[in-house]
Amino acid sequence: MRPDRPRDPVTGPDEGPESPYPIRMSGPVIKGFGRGSKELGIPTANIPADELSQHPELSVGVYYGVVALDPARFSTGETVLPAVLSIGYNPFYKNESKSIEIHIMPPLSAPSPTATTSTDGQVTFHKLPDFYGTPLNLLILGYIRPEYDYISSEALIEDIRVDCEVARRSLQRPAYRCYLDARAVEDPACGGDDCGIVVDAIDGGAMRGMRFCI
């Protein structure tokens, strides 16, 4: 069950990601359980969980990072976007298989908050078009919290809303913000020459030249 205490507003050291982060994963967007959008109103992009066997350091829980979308297939104005992701079994739904569910957020330049709450208490999250099959590169930059069971879907939705704001504030710090820069420009906040080009191109090289800090 979720602890009844205030949440930290940011997570991870201000100086930037510390070991084992950043962790890179990739894969095509696949169909998940279909509950994120339909039942919770929180669209997610699922990628295969196969790579988790290569990352024993990733325990079940909620993380934040950035995703790089293939600009040849997906146009949002920006192709590197902040993200919150869940790795695990989602105790509320009692899943039997481990999954990677990624909620892609608006650019940091977009007005906060990521999710809005109406006068009647309805929470609405940022939505993106369906893009099943689209290659997706994921860079995990930090850990937010363990996964919890919940007494209601409303409690789950509220925690995800807070997760999004924690991720957003965490990524707004200079040592993290540069991970969202896909342009071939060095950012001193990322350590200058330590900002390197992603060499593992996907989809025939469509992502070649996307710049992440490593």
Curated annotation (Swiss-Prot):
Protein species of origin: Aspergillus niger (strain ATCC MYA-4892 / CBS 513.88 / FGSC A1513)
Keywords: ATP-binding, Flavoprotein, FMN, Kinase, Magnesium, Metal-binding, Nucleotide-binding, Transferase, Zinc
One Gene Ontology MF term: ATP binding
Catalytic activity field: riboflavin + ATP = FMN + ADP + H(+)
First-level EC class: transferase
Keyword DNA damage attributed: no
GO cellular-component term (any): mitochondrion
A Pfam family this chain is assigned to: Flavokinase
EC number(s) recorded for this UniProt protein: 2.7.1.26
Stated family: Belongs to the flavokinase family.
GO BP field: FMN biosynthetic process; riboflavin biosynthetic process
Entry cofactors: Zn(2+); Mg(2+)
Co-factor binding comment: Zinc or magnesium.
Keyword Zinc annotated: yes
Residues at the active site: 101
InterPro entries, alphabetized: Riboflavin_kinase, Riboflavin_kinase_bac/euk, Riboflavin_kinase_dom_sf
Coiled-coil blocks: none
Database matches in SMART domains: Flavokinase (SM00904)
Name of the protein in question: Riboflavin kinase
Binding site for Mg(2+): 44, 46
Pathway(s) it belongs to: Cofactor biosynthesis; FMN biosynthesis; FMN from riboflavin (ATP route): step 1/1
Function: Catalyzes the phosphorylation of riboflavin (vitamin B2) to form flavin mononucleotide (FMN) coenzyme.
SUPFAM superfamilies per record: Riboflavin kinase-like
Region described as Disordered: 1-27
Gene3D superfamilies: Riboflavin kinase-like
